[in-house]
Amino acid sequence: MKINKLVLLAFLLLAFTKNQAQEKKLLTLKEAVEIAVTNSDDAALAKTKVETSKLELDNTKNNRYPSVKASGQYLRLSSAHVDSNIQSNNDSGSGSSSGSSAPLKIDQLMIGQVNVAMPIFNGFKLKNSIKESESLYKAETFSEKHSKEQIGLEVVDLFSSLFKAQQMTMLIEDNLKTADQRVKDFTAMEENGLIARNDLLKAQLQQSNVQLSLDNAKKNTAIANYKLITLLKLPQDTEVEIDIEAVKRDMASNQGNTSLGERNDLKALELKKAASESAIKIARGNYYPSLSLTGGYIAFDLNNVLTVTNAMNVGVGVSYDLSNIFKNGKQVKLAQSKAKETEIAVSLMNDQIKEEVFQAQQNYNLSLKQSLVYGKAVEQATENYRIVKDKYDNSLSDTNDLLEADYQQLQAKINQALSKADVAQKYYELQFASGKLTSSLNITQN
């Protein structure tokens, strides 16, 4: 008996711990977007691309500095024979001849050198390469900002889906309570012969349909919640609760903001166009020769024969690829063609953005009108159900009328709840199309 009590206590403790593990987190839309643009993988990828582009720019700038190369060699020689016209000091005396001198032992060679080259002129290719890299780096920074706008829009969509699913779950649960009570009442009435069994079956059928709708709504809630916490990198057992009142306040506070937004993806593309124009200049630079200032130092030692130190040199180097006279024309045309592609892409994006803004504005206007209509529909459906219920209680209407009025009332409430989410969603879609989504939430992009 004591063991059974311990098992029961352990089971209750485990159940309590599991319930405690279900962490509920109240989130505003602003908080969710801030978390997403900081923690999501897409944000990390966009940031890494910016860092990579910055490193590419720094590497290009490094080409402005002189290149310094140092090298050294130590060679071991065996049986080396050296012919030299350099007369040794030992042979400079007059009349002293003691026969042929002993052969020199030459068994090693050491060479050390340092070379410096400083580019002076290369057809302005270096200057334009830096401009190209700077434009691409700036373009990547605007692409990162646009990525954050896209992440924000994804959060808005998930917020809307989760809110809709939660509202449907709540409304259907309330309706299921009514359906359960109706089945109990109809069962008692059928047993007392007050209604036909067919009416009870209709009520039970509606009860089953409501239960199926509730199960589907709970499934949609779980999926939307999972997608949101995955995007936000929250613990997997987190249950997000949406602060809809904060969403309304944020929307209301931003209604007076009439500042013009700019699409960061358009800015990025315009900067890529500038980079393509620099690429044309780089290609044209191949028509010019390259000029550089060179200098060096060399030390040389051939054992027992020759030692050279402090041998410094300074000069100018010129190089020119004659084949560029014939080949480079294609490179220039290729660069010009790519620049033309980018120019057309900018024009297309301008038109696309105008269409997106217009469509988003129309969708937002429609959502506002629909919200008003759905609000009136709830009042009408509620009053209709009250009237039909009174008639049914007084045997002036049948079960079909009652169940239909109940369904219409539920559908009207669901439509009203969904329309609230639609208004917010369409509003922030308009902000995204205008390039103002994060700024409308007072989120500063670095």
Where are these regions (language model features)?
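Periplasmic alpha-helical coiled-coil/stalk elements that build and connect Gram-negative outer-membrane
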Residues: 27, 55, 150-260, 367, ...
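Amphipathic alpha-helical coiled-coil segments
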Residues: 45-60, 147, 151-170, 188, ...
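Acidic, low-complexity, intrinsically disordered peripheral segments
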Residues: 20-22, 78, 236, 415-446
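Bacterial Sec-dependent N-terminal signal peptides
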Residues: 1-29, 446
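Small/polar (Gly/Ser/Thr/Ala-rich) solvent-exposed segments
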Residues: 44, 67-85, 101-107, 117-146, ...
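Transmembrane beta-barrel architecture of outer-membrane proteins
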Residues: 109-111, 157, 202, 290, ...
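Bacterial Sec-pathway N-terminal export signals of envelope proteins
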Residues: 21-69, 73, 79, 232-277, ...
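Extracytoplasmic loops and strand-loop junctions of Gram-negative outer membrane beta-barrel proteins
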Residues: 94-100, 262, 299-300
